[in-house]
Amino acid sequence: MEQSMELSEPTTSTTCTQQHMLNDKWVLYHHLPSNKDWTLSGYTVLMDNIDSVEKTIALNENTPEKMIKYSMMFLMRDGITPMWEDPRNRSGGCFSYKVINKFVEQVWKQMFYLACGESLGLNDSYNTSINGITISPKKNFCIIKIWLRDNKHQDPNMIHNIEHLTKNGVMFKIHGDS
């Protein structure tokens, strides 16, 4: 499905002078499925410097459902590119989940919050190993991945339980095997 999708400027309903800072900064990338340029120039940065709870909420709540379902998005830690060849990804791998379209928006938004809040894994070791999350559309479902910097953390039971994200059939793929 080729269409122009834009992210509206995040807004908040109230003015908040105090920012609740995240432990790390994040960057949200976008890549159209029809784009065959897999170099970094083929990606668009939708928002960088995602460094506060307020920015996370505003961005996540203003991301259109169609963008989540029909384009490729990559939420990565600041300084890590959305490519497995990145030195901080190369020795790692990813969990790969199949999520039907009916639940994609709900699952993606929950994972987005948990990743930014360093709570996607059930312990600090898992959370610090997580480099990002990605979504890729297919016909009636999407593939959502959790990218890790190493391949020591291959137990999907150590990932936070998310409704409609089943651990049955989840695969762990080492990036070097791609």
Predicted features and spans:
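Conserved NAD+-utilizing ADP-ribose enzyme module
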Residues: 1-18, 23-25, 42, 63-178
